[in-house]
Structure formats: structure tokens, C-alpha cells
């Protein structure tokens, strides 16, 4: 049986790691490479670097941040998101040390580019990001750049699912609020035939366990809450105590 994964999420704005609250408020945490090094040391199964200010200003990927991280020599697989507009950006990101990429704005602007990217990098290297909220009349997908929501169907019509390996569903309105991930968002799996990653407001072992026991959910991301205490990754994994979760890793001091 494939083990479920715990993804450590590092949010970057203006080159600095930040705590993000509902895509509206941000508090500084420090240098991204320091957080990444900690997550690698504590045994995260993957690390996601999401640079949230790149696509909004047409800046392209943050290769400077990626370059600093690549020099760390970490063993944990790295996912990068932010400013990827097409094949050229995607190739640069991978050449600067990312193992996989996650795209968001590209789905809205040029979904046809996904095929080109996937043919170059391989479908397994491509993740699509879906910021969701449960509205009064159903699931709403958010274009975070202008904060405009569309019915989920509009987003799905744009996305060529055959060119992505996984989808990350983010509860953007509850991001940064402890234990607040809206599990109703998982109804999206009824419309999709893809493995799901979950993120946004996931902080407690009990909810993490519920989310990960969903058969289509293969991983969950935790962001702000891993910065509050040392060895937070090992603590969460130990509390879960599930054979379905990869075992906690403790770095040797010898």
C-alpha cells in the first residue's frame, strides 16, 4: 500500500518566508532556505515552495530563492509554484533544483501550455493548484490574482486533466486558521479522477487523520503550523500513529 505524504509548505513573498492568512494577511518568518532546511531535517515527505507574488506581477519564477535552496543539498523532494507561465519557465525551475512544479495561473491563462510542459518534464512532474471555497451555490474556484471566483465547472473546463499527475485543493478562505480545513471541499473528488493533495487550515492530528484516510487523498500540506515548534513534523506523524503514513524521521546526531 502506498504511504500517505506530509508536505511542508513554505510560502514566499518578496523573497521572504511568510505566514499567510486567508490570502490577505502576511507575517514574516525569515529566510525560506532556513525553513526548508528545517523541514528536510525533520522528515517532511515533500516540501512545497509557493512564491505567491510572482504571477500577479508577471515576474516569472523566483530563481534566486530556488538557487539558495538548491545549494543546501537537501534530500527531500521539492515542489515549486509561482510565476510559471509556460514551458520555458518550467524547465528553468527544474534546472534550478525543483523535482516537480505546481501551476495555478497557467490554468486560467494558457491551459494548452500544460501539454507542452508535461511532454518535456513528464506528467508526474506537474501538479495543478485549485484554490476552492464552498459557496452558497456550490464549489467556487478562485483566481487569486484578482480574487475573482468562478463556478468550479469553469475551472474544470479549462484544465486538460490528462497532463497533470495530482491536484492540490487549497481551502484558501481558512488558510492560516488552526483546524479549519473545510472537509466539504473533498466532494470535488467526485468530479475528478486524480489523486488529491489538501492544504489550508490543516494543523491538528485528528483532522489530518480524517483527511488522509479519504481514499483519493494522497497527501496533505501543512504550512504556518510547522513553524511554531521544533520537530513539528515528527510530532504530527507520531500522533497520527498510522501505518498508512510514512514513519517520522529523526536525523542522527552521530
Task: Describe each model-derived feature in a short phrase.
Residues 46-65, 105, 168-179:
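Glycine-rich, proline-tolerant flexible connector loops at the mouths of alpha/beta enzymes
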Residues 27-40, 86-92, 146-158, 205-208:
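Short, acidic/polar
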Residues 12-25, 98-175:
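Conserved anion-binding
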Residues 71-101, 183-220:
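Catalytic cores of alpha/beta
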Residues 11, 39, 47, 93, ...:
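Conserved, mostly hydrophobic/aromatic
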Residues 113-121, 208-252:
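C-terminal helical cap(s) of enzyme catalytic domains, especially alpha/beta-barrels
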Residues 5-9, 46-48, 77-81, 99-102, ...:
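Structural preference for beta-strand elements that scaffold enzyme active sites
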Residues 28-29, 60-67, 145-153, 179-187, ...:
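Charged helix-capping and loop-helix junction motifs
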